[in-house]
Amino acid sequence: MVRILRWFIRLYQIAISPLLGPRCRYIPTCSQYALEALQTHGAIKGVWLSSKRICRCHPWGGSGYDPVPPKAIRFISFHQIDSQTHHVAVPFRDRLMKQNLSNHLG
């Protein structure tokens, strides 16, 4: 799905955008933003972010630098260390969960 969407955006960038001229008020352009959003967040969230961006790009809207938001980092908590409960936020890693090391520091 992402591949098809990216193909349509590239088609717009190559065939249609040069005929219309530069119109985007933001950096990166809306089409480049859409490509980055699809690459970073996938089809559903990428389309949502791109649609919101295109709706903001009008003469009475904002302008300037507006990057794609980074992908959220999930956090896990560690509990029961030295008979006290401590919560330590660390980036979630799948290999820790596979090795069953998620409940203690090491």
From Swiss-Prot:
The keyword Cell inner membrane applies. Pfam families: YidD. Its main location: membrane. The keyword Cell membrane applies. It is a peripheral membrane protein. One of its GO terms (cellular component) is plasma membrane. Could be involved in insertion of integral membrane proteins into the membrane. HAMAP family: UPF0161_YidD. This is Putative membrane protein insertion efficiency factor.
